[in-house]
Amino acid sequence: MAVPASQIEEVIAANQDSVVIVDEAYVDFGAESCVPLVDKYENLLVTQTFSKSRSLAGLRIGFAIGSQKLIGYLNDAKFSFNSYTMNAPTIAAGVASVQDEEYFQKTVARVVRTRENTKKELTRLGFTFPDSSTNFIFATHKDIPGEELFQALRSHNIYVRHWNKPRIQDSLRISIGTDEEMQALIAFLEDYLERRGN
């Protein structure tokens, strides 16, 4: 669930003596951006990545928006410590992704549509999950342990994330893929639940 910008603004306003960093990696999938607050708060730094909605995972490209003072501090750190400087092909890919607004809009719309369809199907199959404004769903089945589902899916080459941590051990992080990939996930889960008697 995305935190509303108004709630984030309360945190920023209450912590004027600290830098508040807002990570907007998933903002394009349905969240409200805090970028409009940058001019109002000198202590706010908003970061976004090109890895998610702009399909450039692995290139390690993104940006930060903040006051001139905060950006100056970032540049000082970058030039002193950052061994992950961007090369010319990465910069060219980033520029091209910003210029191709049509592709960006289609990609985001497809992910959101597929996510919403998948949520409906998972609900029908007995899963619950927090509301998602991302490109993944953090789903829990009401009767089946997460480890069991993880192993069953993996044995059929369907890969999701699972953590053996007490608070989340029964949940799976399901990334939104193509419509065909999500249909394969749902078809497998339907069959698995039927065979298991759920």
Residue ranges, per PLM feature:
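Active-site pre-lysine segment of PLP-dependent enzymes
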Residues: 1-20, 24-56
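Residue-level detector of anion-binding/catalytic polar loops
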Residues: 19, 128, 159
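PLP-dependent aminotransferase class I/II
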Residues: 43-123, 127-130
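Short beta-strand-to-loop capping motifs
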Residues: 66, 139-143, 176-178
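Conserved PLP-binding catalytic core of the aspartate aminotransferase-like
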Residues: 111-112, 121-156, 172
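PLP-dependent enzyme catalytic core of the Aspartate aminotransferase-like
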Residues: 152-156, 161, 165-198
